[in-house]
Regions:
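Conserved, well-ordered alpha-helix/loop/beta-strand core segments that scaffold catalytic motifs
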Residues: 1-34, 39, 43
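Beta-lactam-recognizing serine transpeptidase/beta-lactamase-like catalytic domain environment
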Residues: 26-39, 44-98, 103-300
Length: 300
């Protein structure tokens, strides 16, 4: 969708520029008063996909370039430290952070570790492994010394409560966590007919293979909130959200609609929607996940 692509390009650029204006102010104040500083955003990505087919409608990477002048400006583009030729939507991998919590919540509900109505009194700091020197904190506790109180899974998603997902993610375990991430297509090829990287879900084998360091339970806790070694592409995250929205079906992110003859008189190939995986779980689970995500925008 060319029109949507243009709108998304403008929206992403405007959003990043707006954030950088605020960050420039923070940096200036930090230099003047010695307060905590920040960094400017050098790039970003925006993906829009069709929920019921997985078809990408817009794939935006920022900064971008003008295709009409790319050859003339190629050396300049290559030398640009912000890498405008780098397709962040398909090639960039980033820690999903709290956007991964709906995946953890899916696993918790599907495996029967929690029910939708089960509540947990959150305590801010998870101290189960404090004797091992590890006691992670919820963001609200680290920042304000508050807790989220007694909450259920819908509220835990809405308020992005780290403690809730530390507590139950510890019981879930990394293997089940990784299993549901795979069903959602996280760390997997999307099916798009363009070069892409897959990233990876944090697992014991990945950490030990690439770092030579043994897995410890803190890695499981961090994985439950989308950290540790977990990195996915923006397109994978968009397809994952589409699967949540449509009730658990992950489609191929194909951008090929059809192939026609040279004179357009015949359709030689017509693409059909392809299902890559499906979460065969209680359909009501997706309703709770959706409600929690809705609350991020309208209730949090």
């Amino acid at each position: 969708d060319i029109g949507l692509q243009e709108v998304c390009e403008e929206a992403l650029a405007a959003h990043i520029e707006s954030i950088n204006e605020e960050r420039a102010r923070i940096i200036a104040e930090a230099e003047m008063y010695g307060t905590e500083s920040t960094e400017m955003i050098s790039g970003g990505a925006l993906c829009v996909v069709k929920v019921d087919t997985g078809e990408p409608l817009a794939l935006v990477s920022y900064p971008t370039y003008d295709a009409a002048t790319m050859l003339d400006n190629y050396e300049t583009l290559v030398a640009d430290e912000n890498a405008p030729l780098y397709n962040r939507a398909l090639m960039g991998v980033y820690a999903p952070g709290s956007t991964f919590k709906p995946c953890t919540a899916t696993a918790l509900l599907a495996e029967g570790i929690i029910s939708p109505t089960r509540t947990l009194k959150t305590e801010g700091q998870f101290t189960k492994y404090i004797d091992d020197g590890y006691a992670p904190e919820c963001w609200i506790y680290s920042t304000y010394k508050y807790t989220h109180g007694e909450i259920n899974v819908v509220q835990a998603i809405t308020y992005s409560c780290n403690y809730f997902f530390y507590y139950f993610g510890d019981e879930l375990g990394i293997d089940k966590m990784a299993y549901y991430a795979k069903l959602y297509g996280l760390g997997e090829h999307t099916g798009i007919e363009l070069p892409e990287v897959t990233g990876q879900m944090s697992t014991q084998s990945f950490k030990e293979q690439y770092t030579g360091i043994s897995w410890f339970q803190g890695d499981t806790l961090q994985s439950a909130i989308g950290q540790s070694f977990t990195e996915f592409t923006p397109l994978q995250m968009a397809e994952y959200c589409a699967a949540i929205a449509n009730g658990g079906t992950r489609h191929s992110a194909s951008i090929l609609k059809e192939v026609r003859s040279y004179d357009y008189s015949k359709t030689l190939f017509q693409r059909e929607t392809e299902v890559l995986s499906k979460l065969d779980i209680d359909p009501e689970i997706f309703g709770y996940i959706q409600y929690g995500m809705y609350g991020v925008l309208y209730d949090a």
